[in-house]
Amino acid sequence: MIGKRINLTAVELTNNFSKYYLKFAFRITKVEGKSAFTDFGGTECLRDYLSRMVLRRVRRIDTVQDLVTSDKRKIRVKGLGVTGRRVKSSIQVKISNKIKDMLKSIVETSTLEEFVDGMISDEIKSSILREVRSIYPLRNFEVRKTEIIP
């Protein structure tokens, strides 16, 4: 039983139906009687939700980073930005670099719990959309996956 992975949706955890597309993973670390204690394992967006974001004649901008939170937890953060239409590759690179810089500063100044709370409350999403707008307006941004690195 120890080490088993449990997946739950954000709706089951928070009763927030606007986050229907977000799945949480937990790993069982300890069992006492009928109670199981878990540790956070990561998040993931549903493929259906991501494929609805990325349509024809838009640009998908993916970022992948290995970062360390302020409570010394190593996580891999995968972001997805979507532009409203096709853009030059130089603009894509600038957007990607800006997203990476912002995610790095957000993760390194917050604990894992604060980072996940920011994902659920859309604070991270709105701040990145606001900052990247100076380069090129994004249609949408989402942290599509987070993983705990052992």
Describe the residue ranges of each PLM region.
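Hydrophobic-cavity lipid-handling domains and compact docking modules
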Residues: M1-V87
